[in-house]
Regions:
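Acidic, low-complexity, intrinsically disordered peripheral segments
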Residues: 1-6, 86, 242, 367, ...
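Regulatory alphaC helix of protein kinase catalytic domains
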Residues: 15-43, 47
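Small/polar, glycine/serine/threonine/aspartate-rich low-complexity segments that form flexible
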Residues: 24-32, 79-125, 251-262, 293-298, ...
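A glycine-/polar-enriched beta->alpha junction
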Residues: 42-52, 59-75, 87, 109-140, ...
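Metallo-beta-lactamase
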Residues: 223, 277, 284, 440
């Protein structure tokens, strides 16, 4: 039996003769970039492609608004035309003539043939007065909605960046805590193994201590994985090179208090309904749908206008009135038309009106859905923050008790009053309590940021930007076309 134990002891000793803390499981990156929360938020504001796309849509909406406001501005058509006819023509009285004639027109417009007007006027205004009146109003609401949507998109992305940075900092802190626990577990395993080899402790205690140390080593590896994955996700949000490892900076993980949690929930909801940009964007969509509905109601009663004016030089001739191309002189034409359109005996107009009314109802329903979402986000974030605040105190108390128990068990073990398994159990409790404190702090800080953004503002810049930093490893630089900050509009929700 003793001979069988010697190889086992040698195996345990060989396993314990490894570097502690364990070397990184994930190969080291080619470089690191330190980043604090304020720097991450500023980078996302400038480089995130989703935010840039939302702001580009504001420019698109402004372009559409310009086009809507210009519906009744005239178009200018300089041009010329040449006409040649050879062969039979029939007069209105029925007489058929064999005729060769030609004409030439140049100046403003085109399409001047025989006695008709210039078919393509030099100055031409054509448009439905219904659209000329209502489309600028709808386009203005589109601009408002796009601006608020860009704000809401920025808030969403910046919140995601803040959540990921807090998670990265917590994961790095967890990694440090797991390494500390691994080192303490390894030291305990070495001591228990030495006593077991000397015959002063049971072999089972040595095996159990070694198994616990290996579990701690695996926990360190999982923590390394979490740090690397979170850093890559944050780099994606910041449009940075993911091969450069982001390293959290800005100090230790501490509670961040942004919103006073004793504020009544209904007050928070009332403030959010006044300031949420996504709700303002949806209200603009409702207003735009209402404009389009009234446009279809007015369409059968408002005419379409057609105005044309042309001026140029015209001349021509024929084999009946020679010369065949002469008699050039100035000419001008002015034409005006108004007409009303009843589409498909009115059925087409009714169809358009019903469609626009349905779209208005859909927009109203989406606005109510956003209102409910705002209420739910405020209530949930506040509840999460309140629960996490209590969990922080519980976890800290748990850690203090576990550390006291560990000290007492170590002292008892040194005096041969306790078994090593008791120290091992206490160390396991300390390691778990350390992770619990970090997790509670992370949940509290994330809930505070969610509550702050749910009220309608972007995440705050809590610190000044880092100084003397190298340029960030941006993969494809973006330049947001239209920075949007703040929204002065009030929605009027109670």
């Amino acid at each position: 039996m003793e001979g069988a134990q010697k190889p086992e002891a040698a195996t345990r000793q060989a396993d314990l003769n490894v570097p502690v803390p364990s070397p990184p499981l994930i190969p080291p990156p080619p470089g690191e970039y330190p980043i604090d929360l304020s720097t991450a938020l500023r980078l996302a504001e400038a480089e995130n492609p989703t935010i840039a796309a939302a702001r580009a849509r504001i420019l698109e909406a402004l372009a559409l608004q310009t086009g809507a406001r210009a519906l009744l501005l005239p178009s200018i058509n300089p041009g010329t035309n040449y006409h040649l006819h050879t062969g039979n023509l029939q007069r209105s009285a029925g007489t058929v003539l064999n005729l060769t004639d030609q004409s030439l027109y140049f100046g403003g417009g085109a399409g001047a043939i025989v006695a008709g007007t210039v078919t393509i006027p030099m100055v031409n205004i054509i448009g439905t007065l219904t659209e000329a009146w209502f489309e600028p109003l709808a386009a203005h609401q589109r601009v408002i909605g796009s601006s608020f949507t860009a704000l809401a998109t920025a808030n969403e992305i910046l919140l995601d960046v803040a959540i990921l940075h807090l998670e990265l900092l917590a994961n790095q802190t967890t990694l440090d805590a797991q390494r500390l626990t691994e080192r303490q577990s390894h030291d305990l395993a070495v001591i228990v193994n030495d006593f077991a080899v000397a015959g002063e402790r049971r072999t089972a205690d040595a095996n159990r201590a070694q198994a616990d140390w290996k579990l701690r080593r695996a926990a360190v590896q999982r923590a390394e994985e979490s740090v690397a994955v979170t850093a890559a996700r944050l780099a994606n949000r910041l449009n940075l090179d993911p091969t450069i490892r982001l390293r959290p900076a800005g100090g230790p993980l501490v509670p961040i208090n942004l919103i006073a949690l004793d504020t009544p929930t209904h007050d928070l909801i009332a403030s959010a309904l006044q300031n949420r940009p996504d709700l303002a964007a949806q209200s603009a969509e409702v207003a735009r749908a209402e404009v389009h509905y009234h446009e279809e109601l007015a369409r059968p009663w408002i005419p379409t206008v057609w105005l044309g004016y042309s001026a140029g030089v015209f001349g021509g001739g024929s084999n009946v009135v020679p010369p065949i191309l002469a008699h050039f002189g100035g000419r001008s034409d002015f034409d005006a038309s108004l007409f009303w359109t009843i589409m498909n005996l009115g059925a087409g107009n009714i169809s358009l009106q019903n469609r626009r009314y349905a779209i208005l109802g859909e927009a109203e329903a989406r606005r109510v859905r956003v209102i409910n979402l705002v209420r739910q986000e405020i209530t949930s974030a506040r509840a999460q923050a309140l629960a996490a605040r209590d969990q922080i105190e519980i976890a800290r108390s748990e850690l203090a008790s576990a550390e006291n128990g560990l000290r007492e068990d170590r002292e008892r073990s040194r005096n041969n009053l306790g078994r090593p398994i008791e120290v091992l159990n206490s160390l396991s409790l300390v390691g778990g309590a350390r992770v619990n404190v970090i997790a509670a702090l992370l949940r509290y800080n994330q809930a505070q940021f969610r509550l702050f953004v749910a009220l309608g503002s972007p995440p705050p810049l809590l610190e000044p930007p880092q100084e003397n930093l190298p340029p960030p490893p941006v993969t494809t630089p973006l330049h947001a076309p239209l920075p949007v900050t703040g929204h002065p509009f009030k929605l009027g929700f109670e």
